[in-house]
Structure formats: C-alpha cells, structure tokens
Amino acid sequence: MLKQRTLKNPIRATGVGLHTGKPIQLTLLPAPADFGIVFRRVDLNPPVEIPANPYNVGETTLSTCLIKGDVRVSTVEHLMSAMAGLGVDNAVIELDSAEIPIMDGSAGPFVFLIQSAGVLEQDAPKKFLRVKKEVTLRDGDKYASFTPFDGFKVNFSIEFDHPVFRDRRPQTEVEFSTASFVKEVSRARTFGFMHEIEYLRSKGLAQGGSMANAIVVGEYRILNEDGLRFEDEFVKHKILDAIGDLYMLGHGLLADFRAHKSGHSLNNRALRLLLEQKDAWEWVTFEDEQPVPIDYLRPLAVA
C-alpha cells in the first residue's frame, strides 16, 4: 500500500518576509493521517488555522495567498511545492507572520527542512485525483489544461519580450517524482524585473526582496553576479510554482498539466474548474501490489 506521510519530527527555521522584510519564525509539525496541510498563525490570539485548499486561495497578484476572514498567509507556494515533492500529505505549519519566509526564492531550503525533519509513513492510503478527461481553461493567449496521464507531468512555456529571454528555452517539461523534483525543479528561484521591484518598494511591498532571494532582471541582462543556476531556471521556477499551486488540492494529481503564460491565478482557477467537472476525475488509492505511477523516495531515503 502506498501510504500517507507526515513529518517524523518538528523542525524550526527563520527567514525574512518578501514583502515586510521582517524576520519570520516558521515551525513544521507532524499531523495525523487525513489531516491535510494546515497553516497556523501563532502571532494571533487565539491562533488562526487556514487549511491548504483551492477554495481558500484569495489574492494571487504576487504570490499564492490563503485567506480566512481577515486573516491571511501569503507566499505559500514554494513550501507547498516542497511538500508535494517529498510526498508529505499531513503537516501543521506554524508561523508568526502573514507570510511564509522567502528563503532563497526557491523550494530548496524547504526541501532541506523536510529532509532534516524526516518523513514518516502513516497507516492510511495515499489518495490521488486521477484525471479521466481533458479540462482546459483559457484566458486570452494564456491557458492551463489537465489531460489523462499515468503519472504526473508538468509542461510549461513562458513568453517575455525582453533580451534576457529571447535566446533562452521558453518551454520545458518534467515528469514528476521526488528525484526529478529535487534535482531539476526545487532549486529554481523566483525572478522579477528591476523596474517592477522598484515600483513595489515604492508601494511598501517587496521590502525583503534582494538578489539573495530572487533572480533580478535589468533592462538588458541578469543583474545577479552568479547568473542562473541552470539554463532554463526561469521556466523551471514556473513549474515549481505550478506544483505548489496544484498541491492546494491536498492530494497528488495523476494528470498531464500543460500551461502557457500561466500564473498563480490561472493555476488556481484551472484547479477549481477541474474540481467542478466531477465527471472529469476520480479519487484513487494504491492499496495492493499494483504499480504506483509516481516514484516517491522511500521515507528512510528521504530522512
């Protein structure tokens, strides 16, 4: 049986908020089977819990933000992507701020945290949403689609009219597994244009943004001294974001997800559209000895 997973031990980290620029303390805690992933704001009295759920996603302009009443937790997508990558189904994420720390702008530090905590199998089957027929959402020249696939594959393409992007690969595809996620996707950093960052700062946002946690693109070139971590880092980060946004489902997907110029909003709206079309999908588990279509590292290897 392919089992659900949680963290073996609690683990704590500190980082800086992308928008506030202030220190944030983050604690990842184990949770029981069928609990899901829940964010807990411990800076509030009483603490407020917001489950990771596509219908709790509110603001998506600069990141994926979970909202419950007037309480929010933003920039959750990189941590959610790491949870998906290591197959964690159940966890409590405590934080003392309205945003998850940006760390280095990728999911790499969160992968390291989860690996350091260890991963524990639970006595309950891991659930997947298996897509049975195509569901596509179009918005002008952008689109996001789900088609049937025996596994989870993400194909993403981007388009920017800018010198830095003209000679780089605008499209790439990753067949999801723990190994491919950690090696090919997790270290891809978020990116932004210098003029946009300056504008955001003038509005009191992106106070914690720097070349230590983002690829900064100037008028003609990448401004980071050490350049890119790999040639297709821009589009790989879009795949990282999409994996995190789609993991708001709370379960793994068995589908071929293809997107062009998609972002947090379109990813979320496409996921909601899929859920609304109940004849397009089904829940499945792998409780016998049948082959499992996604290769997760064994917990001993993860730990």
UniProtKB/Swiss-Prot annotation:
GO terms for molecular function: metal ion binding; UDP-3-O-acyl-N-acetylglucosamine deacetylase activity. Belongs to the LpxC family. Pathway: Glycolipid biosynthesis; lipid IV(A) biosynthesis; lipid IV(A) from (3R)-3-hydroxytetradecanoyl-[acyl-carrier-protein] and UDP-N-acetyl-alpha-D-glucosamine: step 2/6. Catalyzes the hydrolysis of UDP-3-O-myristoyl-N-acetylglucosamine to form UDP-3-O-myristoylglucosamine and acetate, the committed step in lipid A biosynthesis. Zn(2+) binds at residues 78, 237, 241. Its EC number is 3.5.1.108. It comes from Cellvibrio japonicus (strain Ueda107). Signal peptide: none annotated. It catalyses: a UDP-3-O-[(3R)-3-hydroxyacyl]-N-acetyl-alpha-D-glucosamine + H2O = a UDP-3-O-[(3R)-3-hydroxyacyl]-alpha-D-glucosamine + acetate. The keyword Hydrolase applies. Its cofactor is Zn(2+). The active site is at 264 (proton donor). The keyword Hydrolase applies. One of its GO terms (biological process) is lipid A biosynthetic process. Pfam families: LpxC (PF03331). It is an enzyme of class 3 (hydrolase). This is UDP-3-O-acyl-N-acetylglucosamine deacetylase. GO terms for cellular component: membrane. Keywords: Hydrolase, Lipid A biosynthesis, Lipid biosynthesis, Lipid metabolism, Metal-binding, Zinc. InterPro entries: Ribosomal_Su5_D2-typ_SF, UDP-acyl_GlcNac_deAcase, UDP-acyl_GlcNac_deAcase_C, UDP-acyl_N-AcGlcN_deAcase_N. HAMAP family: LpxC.
